[in-house]
């Protein structure tokens, strides 16, 4: 596998992290807010400012936007589905102006631990022609084979709908499943990931390993999976530049980030991943 084959998607939740990821050689950005919460929908301001940055600097990179209206589980009510639809429509508007915004990231479940096929299919169709990644809500499902088959059936259904539609336009599809193999990290779930890779053969779905991937284990993961894309964070913790600090006031609940530190992508870590992957 040549060095050009390996691509790294980097999750980012600030413009500074976006710039670091781009300068570090990321192939794709997963654009979010609040990575502390697992990633939520980014603000319009962040999307527009990133659009302006890549246009002004003539940068070519794929950007997939997280569509997740709140933290917590992935069981959404109809009001939350409506919010997600509006957010997808906004991403499509930005995509029409800037082709780098080429995909969205979603994940919806039923209360019994199955994929919410009905609403997922609606969002995939609405997102067309953007690519769709189904995120690690997949790892929270009750059965990975059942879940994969459900997502693949959505692709088959949307393809048939597109063939029967004479209005033109792209065909909405789920292009990737982001997964740690139903475990807390990719290495722990590697056997399940290998089974998912087998299931994906002959389909339009690419398995995208993500979760606990480090420079120390990336070579092992590449050798075991033989995939060409991996999802990483590559973050470091930076100290706040605030000189005055009121340590008696907190902006969140008991489980929260400190107001005086923040995580940011480190371009050197991304370059380290790239260098490590080139040794395979």
From Swiss-Prot:
Q: Which family does it belong to?
A: Belongs to the CutC family.
GO MF, one term, reads: copper ion binding
Q: Which Pfam families match?
A: CutC
Q: Which domain of life is it from?
A: Eukaryota
UniProt keywords, alphabetically: Copper
User: Tell me, what does this protein do in biology?
Assistant: Involved in copper homeostasis.
Annotated InterPro entries: CutC-like, CutC-like_dom_sf
Q: What is the protein's name according to its record?
A: Copper homeostasis protein cutC homolog
């Amino acid at each position: 596998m040549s060095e050009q084959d390996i691509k790294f998607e980097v999750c980012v939740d600030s413009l500074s992290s976006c710039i670091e990821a781009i300068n570090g050689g990321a192939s794709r950005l997963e654009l979010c807010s609040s990575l502390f919460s697992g990633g939520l929908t980014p603000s319009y301001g962040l999307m527009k400012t990133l659009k302006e940055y890549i246009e002004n600097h003539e940068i070519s990179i794929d950007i997939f936007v997280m569509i997740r209206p709140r933290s917590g589980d992935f069981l959404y009510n109809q009001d939350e589905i409506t919010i997600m639809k509006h957010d997808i429509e906004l991403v499509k508007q930005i995509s029409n102006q800037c082709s780098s915004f080429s995909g969205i990231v979603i994940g919806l479940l039923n209360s019994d631990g199955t994929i919410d096929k009905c609403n997922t299919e609606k969002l995939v169709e609405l997102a067309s022609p953007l690519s769709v990644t189904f995120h690690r809500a997949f790892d929270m499902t009750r059965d990975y084979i059942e879940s994969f088959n459900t997502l693949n059936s959505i692709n088959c259904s949307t393809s048939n709908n597109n063939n029967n539609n004479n209005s033109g336009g792209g065909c909405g599809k789920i292009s990737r499943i982001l997964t740690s193999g139903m475990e807390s990290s990719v290495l722990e779930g590697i056997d399940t990931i290998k089974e998912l890779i087998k299931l994906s053969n002959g389909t339009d779905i690419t398995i995208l390993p993500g979760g606990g991937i480090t420079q120390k284990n990336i070579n092992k993961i590449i050798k075991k999976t033989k995939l060409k894309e991996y999802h990483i964070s590559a973050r470091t913790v930076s100290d706040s530049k605030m000189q005055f600090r009121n340590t008696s006031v907190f902006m969140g609940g008991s489980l929260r980030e400190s107001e005086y530190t923040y995580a940011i992508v480190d371009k050197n870590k991304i370059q380290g991943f790239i260098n490590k992957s080139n040794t395979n």
